[in-house]
């Protein structure tokens, strides 16, 4: 798993593209502002705003309505350059995360 500083570099101030981990279908793009605010733009349309932060080697998010407005913590497993698999704190697989829409680095991991 990525360590605290690596998680911050992967998330803070970036646009992160989220994909279904099985189908690799684009699901959403999340902008993580340097001020702790985030905005998700869903592939199916619509947006939701929220906040995010860091806790140990993890990061957390809480949106107004997405995921029932609840706070969720995630760990990141690196899979390739600019690509990581997110896991909920309980170990359940979450979105595949990437710094671009291009997932070709997965085949080089």
Listing of model-derived features with the role each one plays in the protein:
Residues 54-56:
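Cysteine-nucleophile amide-bond enzymes
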């Amino acid at each position: 798993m990525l360590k605290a500083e690596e998680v911050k570099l992967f998330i803070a101030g970036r646009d992160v593209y989220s994909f279904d981990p099985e189908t690799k279908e684009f699901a959403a793009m999340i902008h993580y502002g340097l001020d702790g605010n985030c905005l998700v733009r869903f592939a199916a349309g619509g947006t939701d705003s929220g906040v995010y932060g860091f806790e140990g080697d993890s990061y957390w998010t809480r949106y107004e309505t997405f995921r029932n407005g609840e706070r969720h913590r995630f760990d990141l497993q690196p899979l390739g350059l600019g690509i990581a698999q997110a896991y909920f704190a309980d170990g359940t697989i979450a979105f595949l995360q990437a710094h671009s829409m291009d997932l070709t680095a997965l085949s080089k991991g």
